[in-house]
UniProtKB/Swiss-Prot annotation:
The chain crosses the membrane at residues 253-273. It catalyses: L-seryl-[protein] + ATP = O-phospho-L-seryl-[protein] + ADP + H(+); L-threonyl-[protein] + ATP = O-phospho-L-threonyl-[protein] + ADP + H(+). Disulfide bonds: none annotated. The active site is at residue 454. Keywords: ATP-binding, Glycoprotein, Kinase, Membrane, Nucleotide-binding, Phosphoprotein, Receptor, Repeat, Serine/threonine-protein kinase, Signal, Transferase, Transmembrane, Transmembrane helix. Pfam families: Pkinase, Stress-antifung. This is Cysteine-rich receptor-like protein kinase 46. Residues 24-252 are extracellular. Residues 274-625 are cytoplasmic. GO terms for cellular component: membrane. Its EC number is 2.7.11.1.
Length: 625
């Protein structure tokens, strides 16, 4: 049965048809990526009928305006469909691309829907109104296998994508760019679905720009987002003839519009000249106390426009304060998710229904200023499925705001250390959290060369499926190539920061900073997840006891099972849990050289074939034990 071909797929499958020829030029009707939803409908026949009715309703629009939306059916199985062609395609090319995409999407059913990204068009169907979604956790990127490692090429790609991000939202959601230097030329194209407003379009393309620039030094990069598509290449892939036709049509319309408005403008000009003459001959009143609009930002006097560059330079959306105020009902206490060292985190709902998390920071002095700059700088450079997505920022004279994606299950500590909620976390979910956090840290250490410095349960956010995302990069530091330690002499005592109970001993006592301090914090987190106890609030007869030392004692006396969280039930794989606890102990060894890298941790958690070494004593354990 055709419907079983690709049903029940919950992950993006990029370039299924294209992957073998990624080094070759691709066709505009080649499939770049697709997804079929996990959920299924109860009445497949009726759902397919709704799909066909929706397609029939937008067929004419696709040929004439290359875009269409329609919905049909009764909730909860009402179907919503959106499809759009890239503007440079001709009507015939659009029809061909759309026909192929819709045929392929029909194979998803009885899933509740899915989407197909072709190079020249996009189609999506689902059982809810998704039209205002700019980004999604299912967004993906594709990077070509061919490389161009010159610095000039990288610079051109960044300039081309930046140009598209800035131009497309104000050009009906579509823009192309071309830049060259000597024998190198980069071509780019960006398109937003027409249901997005300018702000959401820019947000989507900015996110796409981050994705494709992380492909470098690949010669081609593709960003497949929920609300847009962005591509760069080293050859002309778009239809220049189609662009000329678009330009000709626009010029004709502009000419007609200008001619028709000349009379109106002439009359308006007459009124304006009269007003200017009156103002020049009238007595002038001096208004006292007027000044250029400036404000204090991070303890420094800056012009408002300059503050916005902090966002725009990182390809981030600059949110209006009024938008965030409305989204949180004037930062109502009922919207507050938590409180941190420099402010609070609120849940917000934008006018299109999209939920966001807003970190409001009360800034005064250099330290919080540096942390805000640092957080924006770090997270805007890094993109991974296990790192929280930064959407944008906002600055006022009193506060600064960082806007993130909202994750429904908030932070791990809210669930893990709650006697009732922790029962939601079976071993499968906890293992997923441990592995996902390790993968996020591996990406930070190996790809971004970043040390997080504050890994703990409250900085691990969970989505609806309990998949983890590392957050709060205010203390993160870049470290040298090769993973060498940052010299302690370069760190002032005040710059040694983190959370007691999670900080590695060599960092506390000597200021030695390497990626092994994250390994230590991760090890503490692993022991918390497997035991259900909080490390710095662990209770025992010995007031100096910590969770880490207690687990090590149980390991040494072959009583590890006593430390396993009983709330996971009797069906838990005790052997696997004890193995993961041992990995936690390996990460919390006193000697940083003995702690495994995150790559090794992932291997040890994923494969039981790897024999684990015996962990040495953790720090702060008295020899009298």
């Amino acid at each position: 049965m055709a419907s079983t071909l690709i049903s029940s797929l919950a992950v993006v499958l990029p370039l299924t048809l294209l992957a073998p020829s990624m080094s070759m030029k691709i066709s505009r009707i080649d499939v770049l990526g697709y997804i079929c939803n996990n959920g299924t409908v109860s009445n497949e026949e009726a759902y397919r009928r709704s799909y066909q009715i929706n397609l029939d309703a937008i067929r004419g629009d696709m040929r004439h305006v290359k875009f269409g939306t329609h919905e049909h059916g009764d909730p909860p199985e009402r179907m919503y469909v959106l499809s759009q062609c890239v503007s440079d395609l001709s009507s015939d090319e659009c029809s061909l691309c759309w026909s192929r995409a819709t045929d392929l999407l029909s194979q998803c059913f009885p899933a509740t829907g899915g989407w197909f990204h072709l190079d020249g068009c996009f189609v999506r169907a689902d059982n809810y109104s998704f039209y205002q979604e700019p980004v999604s956790h299912q967004d993906t990127k594709i990077c070509a296998s061919d490389k161009e490692k010159s610095a000039e090429f990288k610079g051109l790609v960044k300039e081309v994508t930046k140009s598209i991000v800035e131009a497309a939202p104000y050009s009906r959601g579509f823009s192309v760019a071309k830049m060259g230097i000597r024998d190198l030329t980069v071509y780019g194209l960006g398109v937003c679905w027409r249901t997005l407003n300018d702000e959401l379009c820019k947000l989507c393309l900015a996110d796409g720009a981050l994705s494709v620039t992380s492909c470098l030094p690949s010669k081609e990069g593709f960003a497949l987002n929920a609300g847009c598509y962005l591509r760069y290449s080293n050859y002309t892939f778009y239809n220049e003839r189609g662009l000329l036709a678009m330009s000709f049509t626009k010029e004709n319309l502009t000419y007609i519009f200008v001619i028709s408005m000349v009379g109106v403008l002439a009359i308006a000009a007459g009124f304006w000249c009269g007003k200017c003459f009156y103002m020049r001959t009238s007595p002038k009143k001096k208004i006292k106390g007027t000044k250029t609009k400036k404000f204090h930002l991070f303890g420094h006097l800056r012009i408002e426009k300059e503050s916005e560059s902090i966002c725009t330079e990182s390809h981030l959306m600059s949110f209006e304060y009024s938008t965030l105020k409305k989204a949180t009902n004037n930062f109502n206490e009922s919207c507050k998710l938590g409180v941190g060292g420099y402010g609070e985190v609120f849940k917000g709902t934008l006018s299109d229904g999209r939920e966001i998390a807003i970190k409001r920071l009360h800034v005064s002095g250099k330290k919080p200023r540096d942390e805000i700059h640092n957080e924006i700088d770090v997270i805007s450079r890094c993109q991974h499925k296990n790192l929280v997505r930064l959407l944008g920022c906002c600055f006022t004279n009193m506060n600064s705001f960082i806007v993130y994606e909202f994750l429904a299950n908030t932070s791990l500590d809210h669930i893990l250390f709650n006697p009732e909620k922790k029962k939601e976390l079976d071993w499968k979910k906890r293992r997923t959290i441990i592995l996902g956090t390790a993968e996020g840290l591996e990406y930070l250490h190996e790809t971004c060369k970043i040390i997080h410095r504050d890994i703990k349960a409250s900085n691990i956010l969970l989505d609806l499926k309990y998949k983890p995302k590392i957050s709060d990069f205010g203390l993160a530091k870049f470290y040298p190539e090769g993973g060498k330690d940052i010299p302690a002499s370069s760190l002032s005592p005040s710059s040694i920061a983190g959370t007691l109970g999670y900080m590695a001993p060599e960092y506390i006592s000597k200021g030695r900073l390497s990626n092994k301090i994250d390994a230590y914090s991760f090890g503490v987190l692993v022991l918390e997840i497997t035991s259900g106890f909080r490390n710095n609030k662990f209770r025992s007869d010995n007031s100096l006891e910590t969770l880490v030392t207690q687990v090590w004692k149980c390991f040494a006396s072959n009583k590890m099972e006593e430390m396993i969280d009983k709330d996971m039930g009797e069906d838990t794989d005790k052997q696997e849990m004890k193995r993961v606890m041992q990995i936690g102990l390996l990460c919390t060894q006193e000697s940083p050289q003995l702690r495994p890298t995150m790559s090794k941790v992932i291997q040890m958690v994923s494969s039981t074939d790897i024999v684990l070494p015996t962990p040495t004593k953790p720090p702060f354990l008295h020899d009298s034990m």
